[in-house]
Protein backbone atom coordinates (compact mmCIF):
# COMPACT_ATOMS: atom_id res chain seq x y z
CA UNK A 1 0.00 0.00 0.00
CA UNK A 2 2.92 2.24 -0.47
CA UNK A 3 1.96 3.31 -4.00
CA UNK A 4 -1.24 4.46 -5.59
CA UNK A 5 -2.95 1.96 -7.89
CA UNK A 6 -2.40 2.40 -11.61
CA UNK A 7 -5.19 2.61 -14.14
CA UNK A 8 -5.32 -1.16 -14.55
CA UNK A 9 -5.95 -1.93 -10.90
CA UNK A 10 -7.58 1.25 -9.60
CA UNK A 11 -10.99 -0.41 -9.36
CA UNK A 12 -9.82 -3.82 -8.17
CA UNK A 13 -10.14 -5.23 -4.68
CA UNK A 14 -6.38 -5.88 -4.43
CA UNK A 15 -5.94 -3.18 -1.82
CA UNK A 16 -2.31 -2.83 -2.83
CA UNK A 17 -1.30 -6.36 -1.86
CA UNK A 18 -0.99 -9.81 -3.49
CA UNK A 19 -4.00 -11.60 -4.89
CA UNK A 20 -3.42 -14.67 -2.72
CA UNK A 21 -3.77 -12.49 0.38
CA UNK A 22 -7.10 -11.12 -0.93
CA UNK A 23 -8.29 -14.70 -1.32
CA UNK A 24 -7.16 -15.46 2.24
CA UNK A 25 -8.93 -12.41 3.71
CA UNK A 26 -12.12 -13.15 1.77
CA UNK A 27 -12.14 -16.76 2.94
CA UNK A 28 -11.46 -15.60 6.48
CA UNK A 29 -14.47 -13.30 6.32
CA UNK A 30 -16.77 -16.00 4.99
CA UNK A 31 -15.67 -18.48 7.66
CA UNK A 32 -15.94 -15.92 10.46
CA UNK A 33 -19.27 -14.54 9.32
CA UNK A 34 -20.80 -18.01 9.08
CA UNK A 35 -22.57 -19.95 6.39
CA UNK A 36 -25.93 -18.22 6.82
CA UNK A 37 -25.32 -15.60 4.16
CA UNK A 38 -27.43 -15.42 1.03
CA UNK A 39 -28.59 -13.11 -1.75
CA UNK A 40 -25.11 -12.13 -2.93
CA UNK A 41 -25.56 -9.22 -5.32
CA UNK A 42 -22.70 -7.27 -6.94
CA UNK A 43 -22.85 -3.56 -6.10
CA UNK A 44 -20.53 -1.03 -7.77
CA UNK A 45 -17.21 -2.55 -6.81
CA UNK A 46 -18.41 -4.27 -3.64
CA UNK A 47 -20.27 -7.54 -3.16
CA UNK A 48 -23.47 -7.21 -1.16
CA UNK A 49 -24.37 -10.01 1.22
CA UNK A 50 -27.38 -10.54 3.45
CA UNK A 51 -26.77 -11.98 6.90
CA UNK A 52 -28.29 -12.15 10.39
CA UNK A 53 -25.30 -12.12 12.72
CA UNK A 54 -25.28 -10.80 16.30
CA UNK A 55 -22.71 -8.10 16.99
CA UNK A 56 -21.21 -8.05 20.46
CA UNK A 57 -21.13 -4.78 22.34
CA UNK A 58 -17.81 -2.96 22.56
CA UNK A 59 -16.37 0.22 23.98
CA UNK A 60 -13.82 2.16 21.93
CA UNK A 61 -12.54 5.74 21.88
CA UNK A 62 -13.89 8.33 19.45
CA UNK A 63 -12.23 11.21 17.62
CA UNK A 64 -12.72 13.45 20.66
CA UNK A 65 -11.02 11.03 23.04
CA UNK A 66 -14.33 10.05 24.66
CA UNK A 67 -15.45 6.49 25.37
CA UNK A 68 -17.89 5.23 22.76
CA UNK A 69 -20.17 2.34 23.72
CA UNK A 70 -21.97 0.44 20.96
CA UNK A 71 -24.67 -0.58 23.42
CA UNK A 72 -25.86 3.03 23.58
CA UNK A 73 -26.77 2.77 19.90
CA UNK A 74 -29.37 0.06 20.50
CA UNK A 75 -32.48 1.22 18.67
CA UNK A 76 -30.50 2.83 15.84
CA UNK A 77 -29.35 1.56 12.47
CA UNK A 78 -25.55 1.58 12.40
CA UNK A 79 -23.36 1.63 9.29
CA UNK A 80 -19.84 0.44 10.09
CA UNK A 81 -16.77 0.71 7.87
CA UNK A 82 -13.18 -0.33 8.50
CA UNK A 83 -10.28 1.84 7.34
CA UNK A 84 -7.03 3.42 8.43
CA UNK A 85 -5.77 6.93 7.83
CA UNK A 86 -2.51 6.25 5.99
CA UNK A 87 -4.15 3.95 3.44
CA UNK A 88 -3.90 5.41 -0.06
CA UNK A 89 -6.04 3.12 -2.21
CA UNK A 90 -9.10 1.26 -0.90
CA UNK A 91 -9.83 3.11 2.36
CA UNK A 92 -10.35 6.52 0.70
CA UNK A 93 -13.00 4.92 -1.53
CA UNK A 94 -14.76 3.32 1.43
CA UNK A 95 -14.67 6.56 3.44
CA UNK A 96 -15.88 8.64 0.50
CA UNK A 97 -18.78 6.23 -0.01
CA UNK A 98 -19.70 6.56 3.66
CA UNK A 99 -19.68 10.33 3.34
CA UNK A 100 -22.06 10.08 0.37
CA UNK A 101 -24.27 7.84 2.49
CA UNK A 102 -24.32 10.49 5.21
CA UNK A 103 -25.21 13.19 2.70
CA UNK A 104 -28.10 11.04 1.46
CA UNK A 105 -29.71 10.82 4.90
CA UNK A 106 -32.52 13.22 5.74
CA UNK A 107 -32.48 15.37 8.87
CA UNK A 108 -34.81 13.08 10.80
CA UNK A 109 -33.03 9.96 9.56
CA UNK A 110 -29.73 11.22 10.96
CA UNK A 111 -31.18 10.97 14.45
CA UNK A 112 -31.89 7.28 13.81
CA UNK A 113 -28.74 6.30 11.91
CA UNK A 114 -25.17 6.25 13.22
CA UNK A 115 -22.09 5.93 11.02
CA UNK A 116 -18.88 4.43 12.39
CA UNK A 117 -15.39 4.21 10.93
CA UNK A 118 -13.28 1.79 12.94
CA UNK A 119 -9.54 1.90 12.45
CA UNK A 120 -7.48 -1.12 11.49
CA UNK A 121 -4.25 0.61 12.58
CA UNK A 122 -4.48 1.81 16.19
CA UNK A 123 -0.71 2.30 16.33
CA UNK A 124 -1.03 5.43 14.20
CA UNK A 125 -4.72 6.32 14.36
CA UNK A 126 -5.06 8.31 17.58
CA UNK A 127 -8.27 10.29 18.25
CA UNK A 128 -6.57 13.45 16.97
CA UNK A 129 -5.44 11.75 13.77
CA UNK A 130 -8.90 10.27 13.20
CA UNK A 131 -10.58 13.64 13.72
CA UNK A 132 -8.34 15.25 11.11
CA UNK A 133 -9.07 12.35 8.77
CA UNK A 134 -12.81 12.78 9.19
CA UNK A 135 -12.59 16.50 8.54
CA UNK A 136 -10.64 15.81 5.36
CA UNK A 137 -13.66 13.93 4.02
CA UNK A 138 -16.20 16.50 5.19
CA UNK A 139 -17.62 14.20 7.86
CA UNK A 140 -20.31 15.63 10.10
CA UNK A 141 -19.54 14.26 13.53
CA UNK A 142 -23.07 14.55 14.91
CA UNK A 143 -23.83 11.05 13.60
CA UNK A 144 -20.45 9.81 12.38
CA UNK A 145 -17.80 8.64 14.85
CA UNK A 146 -14.23 7.60 14.09
CA UNK A 147 -13.08 4.97 16.55
CA UNK A 148 -9.82 3.58 17.86
CA UNK A 149 -8.77 1.61 20.92
CA UNK A 150 -6.34 -0.98 22.18
CA UNK A 151 -5.20 -3.73 19.83
CA UNK A 152 -6.82 -6.29 22.14
CA UNK A 153 -10.26 -4.69 22.07
CA UNK A 154 -10.08 -3.88 18.37
CA UNK A 155 -9.01 -7.44 17.65
CA UNK A 156 -12.27 -8.71 19.12
CA UNK A 157 -14.24 -6.16 17.11
CA UNK A 158 -12.50 -7.06 13.85
CA UNK A 159 -13.13 -10.76 14.50
CA UNK A 160 -16.80 -10.18 15.35
CA UNK A 161 -17.37 -8.37 12.06
CA UNK A 162 -15.28 -10.86 10.07
CA UNK A 163 -12.47 -8.46 9.16
CA UNK A 164 -9.16 -10.16 8.40
CA UNK A 165 -6.10 -8.12 9.36
CA UNK A 166 -2.42 -8.43 8.46
CA UNK A 167 0.07 -5.79 9.62
CA UNK A 168 2.96 -5.45 7.18
CA UNK A 169 4.86 -2.69 8.96
CA UNK A 170 4.26 0.72 10.45
CA UNK A 171 1.47 2.42 8.52
CA UNK A 172 0.92 -0.61 6.28
CA UNK A 173 -2.10 -2.80 6.97
CA UNK A 174 -3.90 -5.29 4.76
CA UNK A 175 -7.51 -5.84 5.77
CA UNK A 176 -10.82 -7.03 4.43
CA UNK A 177 -12.49 -4.02 2.74
CA UNK A 178 -15.78 -4.29 4.58
CA UNK A 179 -18.80 -2.08 5.22
CA UNK A 180 -21.59 -3.50 7.40
CA UNK A 181 -25.11 -2.42 8.31
CA UNK A 182 -26.33 -3.33 11.78
CA UNK A 183 -29.99 -3.10 12.77
CA UNK A 184 -31.56 -1.67 15.92
CA UNK A 185 -31.16 -5.01 17.74
CA UNK A 186 -27.42 -5.17 16.99
CA UNK A 187 -27.81 -7.78 14.28
CA UNK A 188 -25.54 -7.38 11.26
CA UNK A 189 -28.00 -7.52 8.37
CA UNK A 190 -26.08 -6.45 5.27
CA UNK A 191 -22.40 -6.59 4.37
CA UNK A 192 -20.53 -5.01 1.47
CA UNK A 193 -17.16 -6.59 0.76
CA UNK A 194 -15.09 -4.55 -1.67
CA UNK A 195 -13.41 -1.20 -2.16
CA UNK A 196 -16.34 0.90 -3.30
CA UNK A 197 -19.78 0.14 -1.84
CA UNK A 198 -22.56 1.88 -3.75
CA UNK A 199 -23.94 4.62 -1.46
CA UNK A 200 -27.36 4.32 -3.09
CA UNK A 201 -27.51 0.59 -2.33
CA UNK A 202 -26.35 1.23 1.24
CA UNK A 203 -29.04 3.87 1.66
CA UNK A 204 -31.67 1.50 0.29
CA UNK A 205 -30.69 -1.08 2.90
CA UNK A 206 -30.68 1.54 5.66
CA UNK A 207 -34.12 2.76 4.61
CA UNK A 208 -35.48 -0.80 4.59
CA UNK A 209 -34.38 -1.23 8.21
CA UNK A 210 -35.77 2.15 9.23
CA UNK A 211 -39.07 1.29 7.61
CA UNK A 212 -39.15 -1.97 9.53
CA UNK A 213 -38.82 0.04 12.76
CA UNK A 214 -41.80 2.25 11.97
Please give the residue ranges for each predicted region:
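Short loop/turn microsegments at loop-to-beta-strand junctions
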Residues: 55-56, 77-78, 176-178
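A short beta-strand-turn-helix
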Residues: 58-78
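Short active-site neighborhood of thiol/selenol oxidoreductases, capturing the structured segment around
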Residues: 71-94, 98
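Sec/Tat-exported extracytoplasmic proteins
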Residues: 77, 84, 102-109, 137, ...
Amino acid sequence: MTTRPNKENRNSVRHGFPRDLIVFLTIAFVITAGIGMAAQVPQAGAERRVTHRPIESFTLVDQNGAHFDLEKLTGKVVVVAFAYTTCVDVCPLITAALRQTQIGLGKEERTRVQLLTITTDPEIDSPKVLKAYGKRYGAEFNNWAFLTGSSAVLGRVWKNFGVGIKHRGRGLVDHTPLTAIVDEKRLMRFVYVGPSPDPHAVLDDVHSLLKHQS
